[in-house]
Design a protein with these regions (language model features):
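Metal-cofactor-dependent catalytic cores
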Residues: 1-145
Length: 145
């Protein structure tokens, strides 16, 4: 099973906004506390690979940071592209997320209007919370059964 670490945690109070990085967060049954995407649906938490953000920065000569693709979690060192729907990630001591969707419809969004480039429609992992708890930047992330 793959292992990596939590590069960053990002939230926004409402949908349709770029997210701001926070050092730690509480993950509840419905998503990340104080995030506009938390709710009783399958896309409670959004994950991206930090390496993908770095690749866009290199290819486009940009300086995109955490939250600017509207992701909640940037994962480093674990290839999220290897996960399938139903796959699970454990973050820190307690949090377990299950992949409910990979990618989404590519539509004009705050991300494309602001940056001119997007990743979530192609690489975003949309997850539902299986088990909640506290997470912080630097926590271990591993693929689990």
């Amino acid at each position: 099973m793959q292992k990596g670490c939590l590069h960053s945690i990002c939230i926004s109070p409402q949908r349709g906004q770029l997210k701001q990085e926070v050092p730690e967060a509480l993950v509840t049954d419905f998503g990340i506390e104080n995030d506009g995407h938390a709710g009783d649906w399958g896309r409670q938490v959004t994950c991206l690979n930090w390496e993908s953000v770095q690749q866009v920065n290199k290819e486009k000569n940009m300086n995109i940071g955490p939250g600017q693709f509207a992701e909640n979690l940037l994962i480093e060192g674990l290839d999220l592209k290897q996960l399938k729907v139903g796959g699970r990630l454990k973050i820190g001591a307690d949090v377990i997320l299950e992949v409910s969707q990979i990618g989404k419809e590519d539509h004009p969004s705050v991300v494309t209007r602001t940056l001119g480039v997007t990743l979530l429609p192609y690489e975003g992992l949309f997850c539902r919370v299986v088990a909640g708890g506290s997470i912080k930047k630097g926590d271990a992330v591993e693929e689990v059964q």
